[in-house]
Amino acid sequence: MRTLEDSSGTVLHRLIQEQLRYGNLTETRTLLAIQQQALRGGAGAGGTGSPQASLEIGAPEDSQVLQQATRQEPQGQEHQGGETHLAENRLYRLCPQPSKGEELPTYEEAKAHSQYYAAQQAGSRPHVGDRDPRGGVSGGGRRQDEALRELRHGHVRSLSERLLQLSLERNGARVPSHMSSSHSFPQLARSQQGPQPRGPPAEGPEPRGPPPQYPHAVMAQETAAVTDPRYRPRSSPHFQHAEVRILQAQVPPVFLQQQQYQYLPQPQEHSPPLHPAALGHGPPSSFGPPAVEGPPSAQATLGSAHLAQMETVLRENARLQRDNERLQRELESTSEKAGRIEKLENEIQRLSEAHESLMRTSSKREALEKTMRNKMDGEMRRLQDFNRDLRERLESANRHLASKTQEAQAGSQDMVAKLLAQSYEQQQEQEKLEREMALLRGAIEDQRRHAELLEQALGNAQSRAARAEEELRKKQAYVEKVERLQQALGQLQAACEKREQLELRLRTRLEQELKALRAQQRQTGTLAGGGGSHGGSAELSALRLSEQLREKEEQILALEADMTKWEQKYLEERAMRQFAMDAAATAAAQRDTTLIRHSPQPSPSSSFNEGLLPGNHRHQEMESRLKVLHAQILEKDAVIKVLQQRSRKDPGKATQGTLRPAKSVPSIFAAAVGTQGWQGLVSSERQTDARPAGDRVPAEEPPATAPLPAHTKHGSRDGSTQTDGPADNTSACLASEPDGLLGCNSSQRTPSLDSIAATRVQDLSDMVEILI
């Protein structure tokens, strides 16, 4: 099916291309109209999916095809007819599918077939009601019948040859010159020499020439067609031109008749289409145009006669179509019956073969059963003989066993008498052993109680020894603590005494300096008194300021004395608090030891408890040691806090001592130094409070923001003695002349401060080492 469609579409496509390239405009338009009719029919059948959809296009649509066709290049749409449209066409269903080894039709046959196919399609559109609804039967059953396929093949081949012969007979006398001389129409030349047979042609290869070469000008054809007396004018305006009359010689007569029916106003529009068989068997004179041109009345009579003839032909065609469809239905029914019969025969053959195989298996089974029955009979006889022998053996064994039992009963009575005598003796011995065991058990219980008492005494002694050791350790620790605290207290007292002595010396030195300054101020006042009345007010203001300065200095000295007194009280309270903390720590350790001592001790009777005793003892020792270490850590923390507090307060005293190092401007310098000292003291207190409670760092360096003192106490490496190092520098500066006091303070202050800081850090580290 696909091969025939491709071949017909390819031939029509080549013909249109060559006509567009070499032919005239009228022939090109006609071929394009044929192609568009074929494409429109294929598109209608492929779009709706039913044969009736392709037949609903009316005759006026076919009459406008020649006017709408224009010259265009081939767009590749010639193959879009679809297999559905070809399967719906009756002529294609009658046409067989060529096999791979079959020869394709020739160029002229394909051309005539395509023209007739387009004309048949255009003519079969109005006749919708004449189609049988069973015409769309699937072609699967028809393709299975090879005889029917060969018959249709021959019928279609004879039909195409008949159409070609009719066209040659009609057009042979008109254009004999150019048709016979064309190399592309070899069959036309052969048809002029002799008529072609009705039967199918041979299957051998046919000679084919090159593609047709159409002339560029058809003037000779036009003149020949005009002078030909057989051409007569038609009633339709499309047949008034010479090009159309020339094209009539190349188009099959059926196509011309269909075109003529479109312009005749007859009520036979819906008559059935012309059957190819009727066309093939009709007289040739009925398909040609009228030979003589006459008046309109003669043309009307000719048209009516022609219409009557066509009606008879169409009725015959419809009858043949009905007969053909009936025969097709009968053939399909007979083929179905034959298929059923063949299936029944196959089933019967299969059943017979199964029956034969079943008979063979049943015979084999019977023979096998017979052999097995014989074997079973022999086996049963053998087993019966064996059973008889076993029964005889059993009877002889029973007789032998009865004789043996009688002998055994006589011997067993003697043995029972002997065993009774032996059992009586053994019972007496057992009672004696039980009495001895009871005595031994009582002795063992007494020994066990004695051992428990000894173990309890040993445990009590060990616990008392451990308690004594713990108390001894605690007392030793208390003694060491007391010794350390006494040493620290002696050092604190010595430091306090030295500090009081230093304060006394500083106070006396400051009083002397104050007296010297007052004397100097009086001298300057007397010298400046003779200067005039203007200096009187300045002298009064200076005297007033000096009095205020003296009062402030006295207040500062009183505050310093109060501060030293409160510091001493604070240190004493701190020491008392430390003693209270140590007492609390020792009380907690003692409470833990008493809890451990009064805890229930396991009995050492079992070996497992004896193995656990050393482990428990070691565990208790470790706990007591950890508690002692914890108490020592608390003591050291308290000492470190005391030292930190001292280091925090010593810079304050140093700043108080350096409140008046200068003599020229004492009030301003004292205010600045006092502010810096208090800021340093506050920052050092914040840093100390921010440290965690469990901090075990032995000493802290003084904060960088705190001002370093101009005089402080520093001692030797053992911390026993303390001297005043930088104070000598200060006294030297104070003993010098008043004019050089400021220079002494500014030049000697920096190295003295550095040395004081170094000695203070060394003092603190030595003190911490001694206390720890």
UniProtKB/Swiss-Prot annotation:
Motif, PDZ-binding: chain positions: 769-772
Chain intervals with Polar residues compositional bias: 178-191, 718-733
InterPro entries in alphabetical order: Angiomotin, Angiomotin-like, Angiomotin_C
GO BP field: endothelial cell morphogenesis; negative regulation of transcription by RNA polymerase II; positive regulation of protein localization; Wnt signaling pathway
Recorded phenotype for the gene knockout or disruption: Knockout blastocysts show loss of radial actin fibers, a 60% increase in cell area and size of trophectoderm cells of the late stage blastocysts. Loss of hexagonal shape of trophectoderm cells, instead cells present with an uneven pentagonal shape. Significant reduction in the number of blastocysts that successfully hatch from the zona pellucida. Endothelial cell conditional knockouts show no difference in litter size and progeny are viable.
Span list, region Required for interaction with CDH1: 221-303
Name assigned to this protein: Angiomotin-like protein 2
Major location category of this protein: other
Organism: Mus musculus
Protein function: Regulates the translocation of phosphorylated SRC to peripheral cell-matrix adhesion sites. Required for proper architecture of actin filaments. Plays a role in coupling actin fibers to cell junctions in endothelial cells and is therefore required for correct endothelial cell morphology via facilitating transcellular transmission of mechanical force resulting in endothelial cell elongation. Required for the anchoring of radial actin fibers to CDH1 junction complexes at the cell membrane which facilitates organization of radial actin fiber structure and cellular response to contractile forces.
Biased composition (Pro residues): 197-214
Quaternary context: Part of a complex composed of AMOTL2, MAGI1 and CDH5, within the complex AMOTL2 acts as a scaffold protein for the interaction of MAGI1 with CDH5. The complex is required for coupling actin fibers to cell junctions in endothelial cells. Within the complex AMOTL2 (via its N-terminus) interacts with CDH5. Interacts (via N-terminus) with MAGI1. Interacts (via N-terminus) with ACTB; the interaction facilitates binding of cell junction complexes to actin fibers in endothelial cells. Interacts with CDH1; the interaction may facilitate binding of radial actin fibers to cell junction complexes.
Key words of the record: Cell junction, Cell projection, Coiled coil, Cytoplasm, Endosome, Isopeptide bond, Phosphoprotein, Ubl conjugation, Wnt signaling pathway
Region (Disordered): 41-158, 170-239, 260-299, 596-615, 680-752
Tissue specificity statement from the Swiss-Prot or TrEMBL entry: Expressed in skeletal muscle at neuromuscular junctions (at protein level).
Residue positions, PTM Phosphotyrosine: 107
Region of interest (Required for interaction with CDH5), ranges: 101-303
Residues in coiled coil: 305-578
GO MF assignments: actin filament binding; identical protein binding; protein-containing complex binding
Phosphoserine sites (modified residues): 752, 755
